[in-house]
A protein has these predicted regions:
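Active-site loop/oxyanion-hole signature of alpha/beta-hydrolase fold enzymes
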Residues: 28, 32, 41-82, 245
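Conserved HGGG/HGGXW glycine-rich cap/lid loop of the alpha/beta-hydrolase fold
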Residues: 4-52
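Alpha/beta-hydrolase fold catalytic core
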Residues: 1-15, 35-38, 75-76, 182, ...
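Catalytic histidine-centered segment of alpha/beta-hydrolase-like enzymes
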Residues: 231-244
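Conserved serine/cysteine hydrolase catalytic core
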Residues: 165-219
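Gly/Ala-rich beta-loop-alpha elbow adjacent to hydrolase catalytic centers
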Residues: 82, 86, 90
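Flexible "cap/lid" loop of the alpha/beta hydrolase fold
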Residues: 92-95, 102-134
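Conserved alpha/beta-hydrolase catalytic His-Asp/Glu region
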Residues: 116, 131-185
Length: 252
């Protein structure tokens, strides 16, 4: 699958992978900052952003997409940053290709199985009457009945775009994501160990990490460093300056 990506900067390659229902757009500001030091590739994973849609949606497909992307763009031994679902893709890639990654940064996700509790968000997105609404405000009003947090609503509504007729449409492949939602919570699908330098940046207020996960992390990523920031799940959005500082210090 030929993935859409944004590239900027020169130097050592740095690949950034967004989370579920996100896109390369979410990483624009940080990507620009990192481009002062690296050749940054911000990728839209399948069924997200401007990348193609497919009924197949699991970590095997996402990992193979990343392998194909690197081959096609002649990227060797990059640093990789992955948030949430993107972090799971990055971890699977690193374990499957242990000599194919220089340094790995995983943001607010660990290599365990999760019960994905986004059913309400999916219901809300599917309930927006795209054929009737004419403004994003109308879309947000419809979504507010399902999601009380305005920041989360704005995040989800970044997936709305207008087609050639001027009507709203979803960039994300909602049917495929909805069908395979629990698969995004799967544990590691590849077995092995990645011995390269690894940094886990987790949110203190997030449900995705607990201190009891440290042993599991160290079993698969023995050279992992684990750092907590005072955030929820969207670490890089809530504390962008602290996050960027940690990333740049680690990648030096």
């Amino acid at each position: 699958m030929k993935l859409f990506f944004r590239q900027q900067g020169q130097g050592k390659p740095l690949i950034i992978l967004h989370g579920l229902l996100g896109s390369s757009d979410n990483w624009h500001s940080l990507g620009k900052l990192f481009a002062d030091s690296f050749s940054v590739y911000i990728v839209d994973q399948r069924n997200h952003g401007q990348s193609p849609h497919s009924n197949e949606f699991n970590y095997k497909a996402l990992t193979e997409d990343l392998e194909e992307f690197m081959t096609e763009n002649k990227i060797e031994n990059p640093h990789i940053i992955g948030h949430s679902m993107g972090g799971k893709t990055a971890m699977n890639f690193a374990v499957k290709n242990p000599t194919g990654v220089d340094k790995l940064i995983v943001v607010d996700i660990v290599p365990k199985k999760y019960l994905v509790r986004h059913d309400r968000l999916m219901e809300g997105m599917k309930a927006i009457p795209l054929e009737k609404i004419t403004t994003r405000t109308e879309a947000e009003v419809a979504l507010a009945g399902y999601e009380p947090d305005p920041a989360v609503r704005q995040f989800l509504l970044k997936n709305l775009s207008r087609n050639n007729e001027g009507r709203f449409t979803w960039r994300v492949n909602l049917p495929a994501i909805d069908q395979h939602l629990q698969e995004t919570g799967e544990a590691m699908i590849y077995k092995g160990v990645f011995h390269g330098p690894t940094l886990f940046i987790n949110g203190k207020k997030s449900d995705y990490y607990h201190v009891t996960d440290d042993d599991l992390i160290k079993n698969i990523f023995p050279n992992a460093e684990i750092i907590l920031l005072d955030t929820g799940h969207w670490v890089q959005a809530e504390r962008p300056q602290e996050f960027a500082h940690l990333v740049l210090q680690f990648l030096k």
